[in-house]
Amino acid sequence: MNELTLIDFYLCFLAFLLFLVLIMLIIFWFSLELQDIEEPCNKV
């Protein structure tokens, strides 16, 4: 039982890390998109 709970905790931790990485990638991509949109406006 203890091994199963440890494995479940490990899987939940990995899923949480993957979720954080996905959020960071989305925020990073969104910030790049905003910069691409702002650059032409600043040039004009």
UniProtKB/Swiss-Prot annotation:
Membrane topology: Single-pass membrane protein
UniProt entry tagged with the keyword Transmembrane helix: yes
Keywords, alphabetical: Host membrane, Membrane, Transmembrane, Transmembrane helix
Name of the protein described by the UniProt record: Non-structural protein 7b
Matching Pfam families: bCoV_NS7B
CC terms in the record's Gene Ontology section: host cell membrane; membrane
Note: Bat coronavirus 279/2005 is highly similar to SARS-CoV (SARS-like).
Location in or out of the cell: Host membrane
Ranges annotated as spanning the membrane: 9-29
Domain of life: Viruses
Major localization class: host cell
InterPro entries: NS7B_bCoV, ORF7b_SARS-CoV-like
